[in-house]
């Protein structure tokens, strides 16, 4: 590079250093994209811009990548290490790759022909200043060109809202070997690069925004809403104009009013907020979503729902991953001033809790959702319907998912892909409120005052986690499970084919399983699990560290699922981090530290334990069975786990089927033997007295679950003809009684939804027959097994309440007592 050019770039770089603070996507391109800085890199940019080139250079130097301003010298040939696919603001050359780029590609390909050891990495990079999608009708292309003046103002105004996006490399060696090195291949390479950048920009910016009134007019003109308006006028005996006004009012209530400027402002506020409140936001598998967006998929984000913070956190994360924030289905309870208007401009559209009895509302909402898909907007909704009060996944609500399938049946939309997302926190700001609600307190209505009270309490929230799970492409799913689904496509009428409900239910279950498959273990949920396992809610520092090591080794050596994230820190580091969260107390004496979970915190900490309960439930069950029997054969262990596994699978959305248990249990048992928690005696597994403490703590993780199952099986065995509603109610009442008598500090222990799921599973598994009666020999088999795994005190309390209902239905223990009397 000549001296004058160096001076020119240095002068140009001065204002850029002051004005530009770009983000890198992905955050660690060398590792995430598998770049090799020791091999030559050819940087490919979409169009000629010195500001883009210097912004790229700054990030390359920060990432220890080769300087794009330094030319490459290969076999005596000197070539620039960057190339622009298009010239600058000359619009007439926009659609044709400029000759210089084609020539440079050809020169590089030609070098590979003469040098078989050469392999240059072609690295596409896009630099974006601002992400305004523009308004419909303005004709702004997705790969727009800015002249010098426009670029100056873009850098001045949007320099801190810019990002440098590195894409996967293309091996020029592979291109030369597979496709040749002539000029036609170079032209194709330039054309493919142009298409790549155009798609990438669309994924980052999204489609142009419609004028709100134009959108409403289009919806009103749809056949479905026209018919619903006519039905509204006829059923309510009002004029057609009045019915149409009702429809418009519903659109005003529902529809988002997306504003890029609001998103940009909120990004600054949220960046300050996250940095102040959280010690880090950990994002995993975002590249999956970036690739889906770039491949043209219509993305539906389906996260679990822990907190009102979820709405903001996920949009913030997606924005920082170079993706357009989605339109979010938010509960109508959040449509209060000032939150409602702000959320609406951030992309929220509002949904009522129920559609029943309001055909006009359901039609307007369904058509609006379908219009979002047709226009190509990404959408987000919480498949659980509401925030989990217990820390576990809730039974899915399938209404919006059903409408998503119906949107596909309108035809014409891009391929829709569901992306499950696990959101986790080390501190959920509403957790205290959740505990009160589970104890029976009335849910407080959302308001400005409540929001301000919540914000006042926010501090030291630890880490946040956003893990993108395994995507579920709807077209592929329907092709496999409902081959005839295209026969139901109707662009006018909303379809409800016979296969819709079972298909939606199966899809919902798969989504929940994939959310759990992407869970995040962290310092808070691991420490909470260990301390809650101790009956006194306290452990010495050494005992707690030993237990953390046990959990970590199980999760690392026998991963629950490929997408689960496990901390890389040592137990000491995790404990120190958890103690800094000020949830636990430390008592010091001459012997050492004792870590205590205060009584008032115990109920709240069950929330975090429940986030990862499914990850440890099978090791806990193995530990329980070995500990109570002291010696058990592998076959008997498998039989006992097999009896209750369907209930665990339904309750915790476990991903393995019962038939897979032998393959699932084998590595877990081997790991527990390796940790010397149990001993291998041929076909038998034996308790190891030297490691009884960690085994007891591991076993305690499933203690309350087994007690709940024992309650229901006991009632069902004593009264086989009890109806479903009464069974759920009596189980809940007895669980509350046990909670009081035995100090069980887990709100979900008597949660209505948990017992409802259990009873539904018992029916599905044949414990309750078609006429609603229990098959007593089956329920007794399970109860007798469970009664060996719970403490005598708990067993006595259960049997003293449930068993007198019918003498001939009593277990042997109680029947014997009555005979003696």
Swiss-Prot record:
Gene that this sequence comes from: plsB
Name of the protein this chain belongs to: Glycerol-3-phosphate acyltransferase
Signal sequence range: none
HAMAP family on file: Glyc3P_acyltrans
Primary location group: membrane
GO BP annotations, alphabetical order: CDP-diacylglycerol biosynthetic process; fatty acid metabolic process
Domain notes: The HXXXXD motif is essential for acyltransferase activity and may constitute the binding site for the phosphate moiety of the glycerol-3-phosphate.
Documented EC number(s): 2.3.1.15
NCBIfam families the record matches: plsB, PRK04974.1
Reactions performed catalytically: sn-glycerol 3-phosphate + an acyl-CoA = a 1-acyl-sn-glycero-3-phosphate + CoA
GO-annotated cellular components: plasma membrane
Protein localization: Cell inner membrane
Family, similarity comment: Belongs to the GPAT/DAPAT family.
Motif (HXXXXD motif): 304-309
Gene Ontology terms, MF aspect: glycerol-3-phosphate O-acyltransferase activity
Organism: Serratia proteamaculans (strain 568)
């Amino acid at each position: 590079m000549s001296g004058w050019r160096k001076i020119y770039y240095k002068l140009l770089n001065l204002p850029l250093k002051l004005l530009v603070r770009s983000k890198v996507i992905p955050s660690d391109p060398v590792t995430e994209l598998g770049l090799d800085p020791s091999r030559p890199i050819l940087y490919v940019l979409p169009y000629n811009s010195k500001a883009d080139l210097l912004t790229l250079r700054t990030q390359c130097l920060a990432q220890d990548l080769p300087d794009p301003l330094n030319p490459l010298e290969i076999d005596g040939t000197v070539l620039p290490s960057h190339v622009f696919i298009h010239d600058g603001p000359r619009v007439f050359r926009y659609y044709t790759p400029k000759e210089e780029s084609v020539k440079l590609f050809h020169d590089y390909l030609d070098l590979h022909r003469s040098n078989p050891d050469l392999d240059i990495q072609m690295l596409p990079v896009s630099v974006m200043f601002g992400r305004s999608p523009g308004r419909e009708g303005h004709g702004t292309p997705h790969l727009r060109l800015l002249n010098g003046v426009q670029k100056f103002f873009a850098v001045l105004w949007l320099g801190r809202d810019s990002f440098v996006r590195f894409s996967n490399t293309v091996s020029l060696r592979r291109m030369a070997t597979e496709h040749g090195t002539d000029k036609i291949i170079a032209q194709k390479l330039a054309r493919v690069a142009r298409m790549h950048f155009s798609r990438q920009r669309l994924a980052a910016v999204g489609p142009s925004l419609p004028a709100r009134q134009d959108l409403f007019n289009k919806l009103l003109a749809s056949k479905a809403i026209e018919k619903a308006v006519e039905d509204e006028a006829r059923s309510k005996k009002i004029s057609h104009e009045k019915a149409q006004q009702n429809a418009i009012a519903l659109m005003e209530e529902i529809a988002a009013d997306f504003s890029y400027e609001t998103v940009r402002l909120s990004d600054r506020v949220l960046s300050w907020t996250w940095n102040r409140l959280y010690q880090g936001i950990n994002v995993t598998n975002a590249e999956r979503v970036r690739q889906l967006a770039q491949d043209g998929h219509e993305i539906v984000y389906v996260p679990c729902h822990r907190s009102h913070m979820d709405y903001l956190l996920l949009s913030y994360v997606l924005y920082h991953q170079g993706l357009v924030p989605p339109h979010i289905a938010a509960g109508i309870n959040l449509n209060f001033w000032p939150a409602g208007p702000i959320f609406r401009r951030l992309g929220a559209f509002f949904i009522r809790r129920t559609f029943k009895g309001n055909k006009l509302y359901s039609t307007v909402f369904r058509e609006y959702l379908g219009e979002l898909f047709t226009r190509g907007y990404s959408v987000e909704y919480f498949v659980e319907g509401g925030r989990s009060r217990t820390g576990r996944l809730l039974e899915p609500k399938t209404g919006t998912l059903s409408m998503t399938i119906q949107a596909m049946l309108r035809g014409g939309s891009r391929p829709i892909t569901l992306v499950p997302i696990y959101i986790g926190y080390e501190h959920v700001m509403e957790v205290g409120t959740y505990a009160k609600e589970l104890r029976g307190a009335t849910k407080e209505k959302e308001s400005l005052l409540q929001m301000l009270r919540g914000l006042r309490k926010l501090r030291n929230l630890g880490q946040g986690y956003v893990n993108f799970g395994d995507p579920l492409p709807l077209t592929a799913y329907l092709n496999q499970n409902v081959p005839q689904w295209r026969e139901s496509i109707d662009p006018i009428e909303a379809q409800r084919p016979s296969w819709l409900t079972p298909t939606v239910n199966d899809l919902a279950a798969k989504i929940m399983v994939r959310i759990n498959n992407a869970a995040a273990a962290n310092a808070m949920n691991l420490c909470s699990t260990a301390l809650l396992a101790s009956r006194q809610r306290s452990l010495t520092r050494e005992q707690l560290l030993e237990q953390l090591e046990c959990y970590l080794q199980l999760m690392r050596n026998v991963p629950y699922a490929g997408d689960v994230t496990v901390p890389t820190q040592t137990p000491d580091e995790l404990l120190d981090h958890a103690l800094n969260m000020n949830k636990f107390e430390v008592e010091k004496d001459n012997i050492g530290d004792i870590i205590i979970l205060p009584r008032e915190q115990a109920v709240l900490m069950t929330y975090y334990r429940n986030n990862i309960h499914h990850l440890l439930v099978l090791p806990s069950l193995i530990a329980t069975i070995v500990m109570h029997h002291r010696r058990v054969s592998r076959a008997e262990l498998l039989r006992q786990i097999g009896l209750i596994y369907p209930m665990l699978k339904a309750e915790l959305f476990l991903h393995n089927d019962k038939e897979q248990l032998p393959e699932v249990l084998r590595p877990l048992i081997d790991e527990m033997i390796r940790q010397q928690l149990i001993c291998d005696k041929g076909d038998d597994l034996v308790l190891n007295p030297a490691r009884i403490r960690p085994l007891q703590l591991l076993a305690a993780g499933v203690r309350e679950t087994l007690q709940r199952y024992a309650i229901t099986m006991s009632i069902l065995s004593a009264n086989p003809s009890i109806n479903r509603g009464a069974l759920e109610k009596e189980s809940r009442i007895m669980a509350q009684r046990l909670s009081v008598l035995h100090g069980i500090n887990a709100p979900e222990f008597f949660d209505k939804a948990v017992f409802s799921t259990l009873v539904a599973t018992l029916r599905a598994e044949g414990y309750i027959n078609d006429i609603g009666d229990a098959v007593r020999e089956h329920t007794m088999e399970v109860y007798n097994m469970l009664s060996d795994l719970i403490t005598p005190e708990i067993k006595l309390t259960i049997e003293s309440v449930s068993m007198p209902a019918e003498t001939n239905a009593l277990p042997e223990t109680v029947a014997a007592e009555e005979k003696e009397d």
